[in-house]
A protein has these predicted regions:
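Catalytic Walker B motif of ABC-type/P-loop ATPase nucleotide-binding domains
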Residues: 168-171
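Conserved ABC transporter NBD signature motif
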Residues: 72-83, 88
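Conserved ABC ATPase "signature" region
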Residues: 112, 116-139
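ABC transporter nucleotide-binding domain
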Residues: 186-275
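Walker A (P-loop) phosphate-binding loop of ABC-type ATPase nucleotide-binding domains
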Residues: 51-55
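Conserved catalytic motifs of ABC-family nucleotide-binding domains
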Residues: 164
């Protein structure tokens, strides 16, 4: 990577980005992106979330050069995709959701071929280094058709990195893979990020976004409905839950807690939901003890990204 003073502030920039797909006899035109304004900061791990059909793939494919925008501007690494499409495409690597590779090539041949497409000189190619990084060194000369689904997905990551792009987009990178491989891919994403690569991640696994991303945008029906640091987004759900496991089973919420949002859960625990800074946990515990009940264990639960996602998208559906 070059001196940071010469690098752009944003890895990806979209200003009033619009895409309308043509209609047909049986269907009207489809407005996939409705004036999207979005900035992905250089050096971040950025999560792009949204329901199916929200416009995530259209957004990514415009930057990848696979879809033509209807209007608006898009820049990759400070390069306008209209003014210098070749340089803009060279600044981004995209790992597609679909596994689509020639099964009669080996992983080594696949990466060499892709490096050739990007014009990477032979002496600058990192084919073996990339295979090592994604754990496929021992499959270097095997045919792609002999690889497992997880191995093929890792090879896709290596393919996207042959030209050392400063921006890497992973579209549902762990869809359909087991938990162990998911963790391995997460570790590799962190390693790439540590080397200076800006990561853009789309995923249906909200746990994945919460685990990896430091900034998250939620897109729904072609519009960005939230774009904030992860911690700020999580604070939108400004409630916590105090969960008390009583020593003896409880048939009902104690009268002493009548003024609280409390319930007995199926597992017998008492859950009290409260807002940050408005109610005292110590006071709740004191009132619980005043009822004569004894505490076996207690813990607090906070909203996770799934709660925020559902709340934001549900409110739009019901509006």
């Amino acid at each position: 990577m070059s001196d940071s003073s010469s690098m752009p502030e944003f890895a990806l920039e979209a200003t009033d980005l619009r895409k309308t797909y043509a209609g047909s006899k049986n269907a009207p035109p489809k407005e996939a992106l409705k004036g999207v304004d979005l900035r992905v900061r250089r050096g971040s791990i950025f999560g792009l979330l949204g329901p199916n059909g929200a416009g995530k793939s259209t957004f990514i494919n415009i930057f990848a050069g696979l879809v033509n925008k209807t209007s608006g501007t898009a820049k990759t690494w400070g390069i306008d995709i209209d003014r210098d499409s070749r340089a803009a495409r060279a600044a981004i690597g995209v790992v597609p959701q679909e596994i689509n590779m020639d099964v009669f090539f080996t992983p080594h041949e696949t990466l060499e071929l892709m490096a050739g497409f990007y014009g990477v000189p032979k002496e600058e190619r990192r084919t073996d280094e990339l295979l090592e990084a994604v754990g496929l060194s021992d499959k270097r000369d095997a045919y792609v058709r002999q690889l497992s689904g997880g191995m093929k997905r890792r090879l896709l990551v290596a393919k996207a990195m042959v030209h050392t792009p400063p921006v890497l987009v992973l579209d549902e990178p762990t869809a359909g893979v087991d938990i162990e491989l998911r963790r391995q891919l997460w570790a590799y994403v962190r390693e790439l990020h540590a080397r200076g690569t800006t990561i853009v991640l789309t995923t249906h696994y909200l746990e994945e976004a919460q685990e990896l991303c430091d900034e998250i945008a939620i897109i729904d029906q072609g519009e960005v409905i939230a774009c904030e640091p992860k911690e700020t987004l999580l604070k939108r759900m400004d409630s916590k839950t105090l969960v008390i496991d009583p020593v003896e089973p409880m048939a009902a919420v104690p009268a002493e807690l009548a003024g609280y949002d409390a319930e007995i859960r199926e597992d017998g625990s008492l859950a009290i939901t409260y807002r940050y800074g408005e109610q005292s946990v110590a006071e709740m515990i004191e009132k619980f003890r005043a009822s004569g009940a004894r505490i076996d264990d207690l813990r607090t639960e906070e909203a996770d990204l799934e709660d925020v996602f559902l709340a934001l998208t549900y409110h739009r559906e019901s509006a």
